[in-house]
Amino acid sequence: IGALTGFTPFKVEADDEPLCHFVESNADTPFFKKMLYTNEIDGIVSHFGQYRNGFLFVMLPPEGGTLELWLSEDKQVVNFKGNYNLRLLRFACWIAYGVATAPFKTVAIHTSTIVCQSKAILFLGESGTGKSTHTRLWRENIQGSVLLNDDSPILRIIDGEPWIYGSPWSGKTPCYKNESYPLAACVRLSQAPFNKI
């Protein structure tokens, strides 16, 4: 994990018991009991589902060599096995983090996020809609606007209030900030088939 860019700002001293342990495993990968989700991004086919004792995630890149991870039912142990290509490992860590932190009212969101007047604003939309372009325009035209994360910030509910955190997963823009802000707004972007102001 130390080879993955973006994680250094989030490193903490090991004073407390960690939320979960990442373990390189030599055990046999469990079998899916129930498939929950399958998708393909950039030729990488991913499967997510349940096995007998928890959750299983498998990535199959076009060049071969799968990366498999499975989380125990209590989500305290994340087992990794297979192809440790950094691109695969980064995404697998994102999945593991999401599953392990879900019980703590935490979720990663696909969005580009700015901070303006000490509050976070999320710009949501399908890939290619213009989320990053929109946050860039805010930074260029609205004084005090700064980028918090350009791909996958973390939303967490604390005492009934939504907070947004920077994360190690910021897409193509290297913006890894260990900061948090209250949520001011969520803006859903859609793209028209024409240009008009």
Predicted regions and their residues:
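Hydrophobic positions on the alpha1 helix immediately C-terminal to the Walker A/P-loop
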Residues: 134
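Conserved lysine of the Walker
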Residues: 131
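A noncatalytic interaction/capping subdomain that flanks phosphate/NTP-handling catalytic cores
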Residues: 1-122, 126-127, 137-146, 154-197
